[in-house]
Amino acid sequence: MDIKKEHWSPLLLDWFAAHGRDLPWRDESPRDPYKVWVSEIMLQQTKVETVRPYYDSWMDHFPTIPALAAASQDEVLRQWQGLGYYSRARNLHEAVQEVQAKYGGHVPENKKDVQSLKGVGDYTAGAILSLAYGQKEAAVDGNVLRIFARLYDIEENILSTPVKKKITALVEEQLPDEAPGTFNEALM
């Protein structure tokens, strides 16, 4: 099989169906965009095993956008305590307050509006849009950059903007029309 020409996403999806981990933020179908968002922010620079109890506790305290938006920053930081990188919690809190005020508590369904939220970049926007809304959006993080660089024999610096764009285009070529979020999760 020539990996450069073959559309291999069905193989990855089959593998993920058999081997994907059972995680609390994957419990619902369709997925709640708020829960996807919280999990993705918590998982930045943090292992899944570490995040799991924090996520469960967070959802007990702030199960919805209105609940988090109404919380004080002190409450938010208290719930985040132990996860580190506290700017993630402050940014999430501020962004959720914006979603509550500007969008009536509904996470926007277009990339431009999602990316305008504090602390949300290309990866998180792609994850929210693909996982919660089923949109064909790539979620490319450092792990995906490394995987695709190996698969496609890319030797240039994967952190350079041109190479990131090249790899994102390759991911987009592989994204299936059905279940793009599942494909993104399988890559992660």
Tell what function each PLM region has.
Residues 2-6, 10-11, 17-188:
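Catalytic cores of DNA base-excision repair glycosylases
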